[in-house]
């Protein structure tokens, strides 16, 4: 089937967005590397946001300088940026392969007017690509602001980046469609093709990688928000640290609920987020170990350690619930429909045995005989049809 004008417009606009995404990915790789070296337009090294050698948990915020609170240091920040760069690169490769798959399938398997639109919606629609572009752009802006040591502006920019990333992963999993629309879209996917392989194998891998990044983004969002709070209000540094840990814990719990009640309807295997939560737990635990003296002097060592330990405990509990509901088939909602029968219902063809009615009395039999003689027998349907056909034949012969 030849592609219509609307299909050609969808394909061309989708490829153009993919081209812009590739350019944005190159820029997102260049900006962190350029911000690492001096003399390239960045005033400060963006990784050294605070001086942890002056960390004091018993003092309050001072408006004269940047009060050090809990944040990512140089190794953790580099790991986060490098992992984000790797995940975005894998996603760009996936989208390029998706464009090749759609181009190869449109000449052979585009049998309906909705085929190409369904393919693009399942692989990654225009809105998903556009949000992915905004996500990479906001990450570059965050690095720019960090290099200028604007803590409040950096927290605001990263809040925007986190919201965009949340919308992106939600749209990628749900395909921006209702649950009942997904099977209808999948009916247009041809079997044993490159497109089917991308949807069944590579897209789940890409989604799980994005989920691991989402968990790390929750951690960085919590740390940047509480750093902005700690440098804006007259609060203890320890309160800002407790707030960051509890905020990260609350965000993960919200995502667990979102996964169990909504996202599992679209994709069952979601392990990337749990891996990201464990990595975030290790990142939070490193400052407690690295700056143990500061926590011990403030008598907060055990309290912070116990508070941070709640993160992996709840994560393990969420994994157990996911295994119970997914692999063991327990607590799964029943289908809202009844399956059709595979074979026709059997009909009982046993002959019915009619019992002989009891004999009538003599007077009744005599009356019935008189009635039969006086009343002519009714004509059957066959006799009526036969007589009508003969009358028509006679009329035709007379006419001839």
Swiss-Prot record:
The keyword Kinase does not apply. InterPro entries: Herpes_glycop_M. Signal peptide: none annotated. It is a multi-pass membrane protein. Residues 348-394 are annotated as: Disordered. Residues 1-16, 98-113, 174-208, 256-270, 322-400 are intravirion. N-glycosylated. GO terms for cellular component: host cell endosome membrane; host cell Golgi apparatus; host cell nuclear inner membrane; membrane; viral envelope; virion membrane. Its main location: virion. Residues 38-76, 135-152, 230-234, 292-300 are virion surface. Keywords: Disulfide bond, Glycoprotein, Host endosome, Host Golgi apparatus, Host membrane, Host nucleus, Membrane, Transmembrane, Transmembrane helix, Viral envelope protein, Virion. It holds the Pfam family Herpes_glycop. The keyword Disulfide bond applies. It is found in: Virion membrane; Host Golgi apparatus, Host trans-Golgi network; Host endosome membrane; Host nucleus inner membrane. The chain crosses the membrane at residues 17-37, 77-97, 114-134, 153-173, 209-229, 235-255, 271-291, 301-321. Envelope glycoprotein important for virion assembly and egress. Plays a role in the correct incorporation of gH-gL into virion membrane. Directs the glycoprotein N (gN) to the host trans-Golgi network. HAMAP family: HSV_GM. Interacts (via N-terminus) with gN (via N-terminus). The gM-gN heterodimer forms the gCII complex. Belongs to the herpesviridae glycoprotein M family. This is Envelope glycoprotein M. The gene is gM.
